[in-house]
């Protein structure tokens, strides 16, 4: 069975918020050809998308063709809208969450869902987080790697993580609004350089700021294999040991200890890096993720894992076992995989 924890979806239509304060910054969908649309931000085209971004039928057909049994659905990060006034941001989040919940409810053996919350208003974010879990039946939430430039250890954000831990909600951190993006205007550098750096910044902030130490029950995962954090763990630990006066002011536990407490997806694009991640973190911390349906993702989810020749027990853990543990979902919910030729213990 393959459970893909990193996939994005959005409704075919979005509300027009242009009359709201800052309304031009809200994303609009401009359908310009059959099965094709543009995401419009600030009056300019941000990204070209195809019907698999919104059509459940197209998505299921592509999942079947690629051998993916379950997708974990989350919104497209450009829709986070943390910059917006809290009320319209909450309105948008509720619409996006209702849409994801509807897709999951219609196909419970093929999808699980993560909501989005207005992180710029912790009170509203917690309220919507509770609704996502208690009313909509979603497994948790996807959040950005910073909130309008505030790192994730900012004190005002702690109650959100505390609520997630209390609710048993999974948290998926996706890079967005990358640091240094003003210097990365060419060559797709925000995606190639900014995102890995942004994720390391998020992880280090949560560790050094003591958030993960204070909330040991928090099930938190990071996209793109945790970005640059795993590759630079030696440097980070050395800095922690050499300058505790700078690094250990809020948490005296070594960053290395958290390699066994956070989750990452498998989207690292390179067999050597995936093997390194496995050696560093173990299979219980790595879950299949593809970034479907976007071009920097893995076109055939699980192909990188399969290419490494891992033992079957390890392979099964990477393809679905870790995902189900992070989401706190039983394999039996997705038992339909067996009727599609792949049981819970098969790839």
Feature roles, as predicted:
Residues 8, 176-177, 226, 293:
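Catalytic metal-binding/acid-base residues of hydrolase active sites
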Residues 3-5, 71-73, 112-115, 141-143, ...:
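Hydrophobic faces of well-ordered beta-strands that scaffold small-molecule active sites
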Residues 69-206:
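Active-site gating/metal-coordination segments in enzymes
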Residues 1, 5, 12-70, 98-106, ...:
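Mid-to-C-terminal alpha-helical segments outside catalytic/metal-binding sites
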Residues 11-51, 83, 178-197, 236-259:
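Active-site gating loops and adjacent loop-to-helix segments of metal-dependent hydrolytic enzymes
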Residues 49-54, 81, 119-125, 148-155, ...:
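Acidic-and-aromatic substrate-binding clefts and catalytic sites of carbohydrate-active enzymes
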Residues 228-233, 237-238, 272-273:
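Short acidic/glycine-rich loop or secondary-structure boundary segments that cap or lie
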């Amino acid at each position: 069975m393959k459970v893909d924890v990193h996939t994005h979806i959005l409704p075919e239509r979005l509300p027009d918020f242009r009359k709201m304060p800052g309304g031009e910054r809200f994303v609009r969908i401009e359908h310009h050809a059959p099965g094709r649309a543009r995401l419009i931000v600030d009056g300019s085209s941000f990204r070209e998308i195809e019907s698999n971004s919104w059509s459940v039928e197209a998505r299921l057909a592509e999942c079947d063709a690629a051998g993916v049994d379950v997708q974990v659905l989350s919104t497209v990060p450009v829709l986070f809208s943390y910059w917006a006034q809290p009320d319209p941001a909450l309105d948008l989040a509720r619409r996006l969450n209702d849409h994801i919940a509807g897709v999951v409810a219609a196909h419970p053996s093929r999808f699980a869902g993560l909501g989005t919350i207005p992180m710029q208003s912790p009170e509203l974010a917690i309220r919507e987080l509770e609704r996502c879990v208690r009313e909509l039946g979603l497994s948790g939430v996807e959040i950005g790697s910073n909130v309008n430039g505030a790192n994730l250890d900012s004190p005002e954000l702690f109650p959100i993580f505390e609520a997630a831990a209390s609710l048993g909600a999974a948290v998926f951190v996706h890079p967005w609004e990358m640091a240094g993006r003003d210097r990365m205007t060419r060559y797709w550098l925000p995606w190639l350089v900014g995102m890995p750096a942004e994720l390391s910044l998020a992880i280090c902030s949560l560790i050094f700021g003591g958030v993960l130490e204070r909330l040991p029950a928090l099930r938190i995962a990071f996209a793109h294999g945790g970005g640059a954090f795993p590759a630079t763990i030696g440097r980070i630990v050395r800095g922690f040991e050499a300058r505790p006066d700078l690094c250990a002011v809020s948490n005296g536990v070594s960053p290395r200890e958290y390699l066994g407490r956070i989750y990452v997806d498998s989207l690292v694009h390179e067999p050597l890096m995936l093997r390194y991640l496995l050696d560093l973190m173990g299979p219980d911390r790595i879950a299949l993720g593809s970034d479907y349906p976007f071009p920097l993702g893995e076109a055939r989810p699980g192909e990188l894992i399969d290419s490494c020749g891992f033992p079957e027990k390890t392979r099964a853990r990477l393809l679905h076992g870790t995902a189900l543990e992070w989401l706190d979902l039983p394999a039996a919910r997705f038992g339909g995989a067996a009727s599609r030729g792949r049981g819970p213990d098969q790839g």
